[in-house]
């Protein structure tokens, strides 16, 4: 979730202020961000869309393995082929395939709950997004000095929405795509310089 607000037009035409969500995958070897999809609320359908974008648009091939978060969207039965609580993967029939295997991914590995550091590459990327992208928007309501909740920036988001000062979701995605491809992806990761 970005720490800035955008104007979102619901299917019924009502415009509200939301914090957009980003679904994306990081290639651990190159640190490239692939399959980025922005949405109002992330769910397993958004993750499917993100993986399909990764395969057909960004990477042009299916990843052999993926490392997934422990969230319910990533571990839903239609994604993995197994019940969320079945860590032993005891399915033996074709019904246990799930979306990941159905598109050609050989295997997936789940992060342990409350161990954010095992997903270091994507978590570090989200920190970079906050520091180098999100903070520059007028609607930014994250922290300026650290990660303390009491240090969050107060803004009149409803007033900004009424005055038309918030970017639309499409405008925000356009700014995001520009930043991702023209600023982030052109720099070599310091972890790869060794």
Residue spans of the language-model regions?
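Globin-like tetrapyrrole-binding proteins
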Residues: 63-64, 70-194
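A short, conserved beta-strand element enriched in hydrophobic/aromatic residues
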Residues: 1-71, 110-113
